[in-house]
């Protein structure tokens, strides 16, 4: 029986990515900061991200908060000139989506006016209303949870997120709220592999991993790290391919193959995950139970069978209550 090959695609679109997610196809995403680097990997890349990580790998900043809207527009305009086949997504920089809804929409809309197909926005909680406002203006949004580099000063450094029960449940809740706000994809950075797998399995949108284990729909390759390893980049956020290959393009293609078979950064996740926490996380394709009243909490506690289960229900109720305060 002959096998019909998939027709080549002239331009990657969001509906196409979502269809590939449903088909179980592995996707590949890389960064692009200028017109020279952007087209090099393009024939085999699905998403090209003009990331604020350019502040680290191109401009020498220690973190991403110094990156401005003007800097992002500069890098985006350069990448657009290469006419990439991949879906082009641009990062909303620090303070570009914090001040007001109007300013947030203007900054995100500016990306589309310059040729991007979507904007990426970090955080959950209070940022979800901003996501809804942007999407209501017909601007596609990619979410980002876990280790969010723009909040590095609050986190006290580049630290793994989601090892504690309240952190993991809040991340799972935020992931579903972002999906409900119509994000077309979600980045999970610096989260334990088992938590990443639970989140990915419970969502219908594609998930994109950065140092979060192998179970996302796709993995991110920072293109510049195939040439060098800047000291400011977290070691878990890209595959260990630099020493294995002398040719820069061989490095990139090796990283691409690792992403395609879900081995970035490694099949064995470097990020630990407490077994007790794994037992308390919900599984399956349904969002975690959200308890919104004391009466509902009491009814649910009466049906629970163990002290651990009751403790987990109380934590979820606390997180649900905090979500309404944010």
UniProtKB/Swiss-Prot annotation:
Record's protein name? 3-methyl-2-oxobutanoate hydroxymethyltransferase 1
Q: What class of enzyme is it?
A: transferase
Q: How is the cofactor bound?
A: Binds 1 Mg(2+) ion per subunit.
Instruction: Name the pathway.
Output: Cofactor biosynthesis; (R)-pantothenate biosynthesis; (R)-pantoate from 3-methyl-2-oxobutanoate: step 1/2
Question: Where is Mg(2+) annotated to bind?
Answer: 52, 91, 122
Q: How does it assemble?
A: Homodecamer; pentamer of dimers.
Q: Which GO terms describe its cellular component?
A: cytoplasm
- What does it do? Catalyzes the reversible reaction in which hydroxymethyl group from 5,10-methylenetetrahydrofolate is transferred onto alpha-ketoisovalerate to form ketopantoate.
The answer, when asked if Transmembrane helix is one of the entry's keywords, is no
Is Lipoprotein among the key words of this record? no
Q: Where in the cell is it found?
A: Cytoplasm
Protein's GO biological process = pantothenate biosynthetic process
Residue ranges that the Swiss-Prot or TrEMBL entry lists as coiled coil: none
Task: Cite the source lineage.
Answer: Bacteria, Pseudomonadati, Pseudomonadota, Alphaproteobacteria, Hyphomicrobiales
> Which HAMAP family does this UniProt record tie to the protein?
PanB (MF_00156)
Question: Where this protein primarily resides, as one coarse class?
Answer: cytoplasm
Q: State the family named in the UniProt similarity comment for this chain.
A: Belongs to the PanB family.
């Amino acid at each position: 029986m002959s096998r019909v090959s998939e027709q080549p695609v002239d331009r990657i679109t969001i509906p196409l990515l979502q269809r590939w997610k449903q088909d179980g196809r592995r996707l590949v995403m890389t960064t692009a900061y200028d017109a020279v680097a952007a087209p090099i990997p393009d024939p085999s890349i699905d998403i090209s991200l003009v990331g604020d990580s350019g502040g680290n790998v191109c401009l020498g900043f220690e973190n991403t908060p110094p990156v401005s809207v003007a800097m992002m527009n500069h890098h985006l305009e350069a990448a657009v000139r290469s006419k990439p086949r991949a879906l082009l997504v641009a990062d909303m920089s620090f303070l570009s989506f914090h001040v007001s809804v109007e300013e947030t929409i203007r900054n995100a809309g500016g990306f589309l006016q310059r040729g991007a197909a979507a904007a990426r926005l970090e955080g959950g909680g209070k940022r979800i209303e901003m996501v809804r406002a942007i999407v209501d203006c017909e601007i596609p949004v990619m979410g980002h949870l876990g280790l969010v580099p723009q909040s590095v000063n609050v986190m006290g450094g580049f630290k793994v997120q989601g090892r504690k029960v309240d952190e993991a449940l809040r991340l799972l809740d935020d992931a579903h709220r972002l999906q409900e706000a119509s994000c077309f994809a979600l980045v999970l950075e610096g989260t334990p592999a088992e938590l990443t797998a639970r989140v990915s399995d419970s969502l219908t949108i594609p998930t994109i991993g950065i140092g979060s284990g192998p179970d996302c729909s796709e993995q991110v390759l920072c293109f510049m790290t195939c040439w060098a390893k800047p000291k400011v980049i977290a070691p878990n956020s890209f595959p260990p391919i630099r020493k294995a290959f002398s040719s820069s393009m061989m490095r990139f293609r090796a990283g691409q193959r690792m992403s395609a078979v879900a081995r970035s950064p490694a099949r064995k996740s470097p990020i630990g995950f407490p077994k007790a926490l794994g037992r308390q996380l919900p599984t399956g394709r349904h969002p975690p139970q959200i308890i919104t009243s004391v009466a509902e909490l009491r009814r649910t506690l009466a049906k629970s069978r163990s002290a651990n289960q009751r403790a987990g229900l109380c934590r979820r109720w606390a997180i649900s209550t905090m979500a309404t305060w944010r």
